[in-house]
Amino acid sequence: MIELVPSLRKFAYSLTGNLHDADDLLQTTIERLLSKPLPDQVTLMAWAFRVCRNCWIDEYRAKKVRVHANDTLSYEANSASCHADMDEVITQAVTLKQVSSAMDDLPCEQRETLSLVAVQGMSYAEASDVLQVPKGTIMSRLARARAKISNLLNSQNEVLS
């Protein structure tokens, strides 16, 4: 069997195309040859090459399954990520609708002030110029508007829970 090793190694390399994989295949082949008796009416060389080829086919199939399993796991992870992203979009849409509904329940002055500062991004000074009220009034309207929206959203969440 020792004299077959160089030929088996070349054959394994021709199957795998890689020296490291060829050496692994050669080792598996030799282990299998040593663990099973030689069948009757078969030459050692023919048997050794057949075992090497069968080991390569087994490894090829196993790699294919591993690659498919990795692709499936990757797809499931991406799918889960996609579902998580979709859940996030839905949650944001529901939250936006709740906030919009809560803003509609605010008194006109508070809704205008909150819209200018929180939605439009104006500073307190800019909002006070637009609404022609003191800066302190803007701050107090914002505080009351935020408190009312917070209470409305908390009560809606309690109903949903």
Locate each region found by the language model:
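Sigma70-family region 2
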Residues: 27-44, 62-63
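Short, small-hydrophobic-rich alpha-helical interface motif
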Residues: 8, 12, 22-33, 127, ...
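Arg/Lys-rich amphipathic alpha helix in sigma70-family domain 2
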Residues: 51-71, 92
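C-terminal edge and immediately downstream basic/flexible tail or linker adjoining helix-turn-helix-like DNA-binding
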Residues: 68, 125, 129-132, 146-161
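A short pre-motif secondary-structure segment
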Residues: 113-117
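Helix-turn-helix DNA-binding motif, specifically the short coil turn and the N-cap/start of the second
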Residues: 18, 123, 132-137
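A short, charge-rich alpha-helical start-of-domain segment used by transcription regulators
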Residues: 1-10, 14, 20-23, 39, ...
